[in-house]
């Protein structure tokens, strides 16, 4: 069976983990944590980065920094992972779900402004498959209404937004705050792991305090205070040096990893462009808007209906290939229906929930396997 995902190891992970253990500093915020954070800040232009134990934790930190309180409204796309909404629900937010575009799963920026009320505190955008949302439009709306923008960039490492003036900005560097994932399904990994990026300077000091269990420990270690104490809310968000050491091995090979994934993505796109199935209607290829780049986090197809998708997945499974669907629309989840009185009609989110299917894409997927997958799909 060709798996959907296989975590890639560069060969340096165990060496760096051993180095971290031998250093005598493995509890977190040591050498490897600093190396990783400095790399991301320099490479992608983030003002401040803090590694976390997961992207969920990074989103929860963002919710605290945005000062989300009971009754505040937060606009979130419905077609996303539960953490995107849950991080804000935990702070008491009333989630207002937004629909996707009809031709790609990202939040429909043209629908956002109609969802804003006097209670709206934040807009959370998700760069699905590592492909940018329309950030110029979203930031313009947010700035007009004085609303914080948080980028859920879990899938978007090393992907960019291109403004109309040609300016190229890394995803995660545009909103006030952003969150990344290094889960084993992502392009670069640490098993579990994430990162909060702070692009608005007013949040940096408090972010460090929240990251360090509500203490000003970071300031103490920089010699800015003579002792540290409990000064704010927070939790134990920082990862151990073992996780950071693993991540550093991945970072060192990021360009090679990205180049290989993009090569696979491009071959899928080329090979399936002329696909004319007989047993199902022709699925749609992924859309990368002109303002976005592609980091090859995911290759998906959009079937015409749920029955076609079921037939597609079963056909590949019968041939030894694991393909998978993705999110169920959060506005239809049992938890949301229980806690919220809002009733939303989000047809595009529902369509992607019913029709989107993802193909295997990982570093060690061979050329022969890619061709086999393409040819197997063409048998439909």
Where are these regions (language model features)?
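Active-site phosphate-binding strand-loop segment of PLP-dependent enzymes
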Residues: 103-190, 195-202, 358
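N-terminal "arm"/small-domain region of PLP-dependent enzymes with the aminotransferase-like
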Residues: 1-26, 229-231, 360
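Helix C-cap/helix->beta junction micro-motif
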Residues: 91, 144-145, 319
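Conserved PLP-anchoring active-site segment centered on the Schiff-base-forming lysine
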Residues: 62-116, 122-124
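Hydrophobic/aromatic ligand-binding patch that stacks against planar heteroaromatic rings
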Residues: 86-88, 141, 170, 242
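PLP-dependent aminotransferase class I/II
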Residues: 33-38, 43-49, 110, 122-126, ...
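Phosphate-binding glycine-rich loop
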Residues: 26-73, 86-91, 97-98, 164
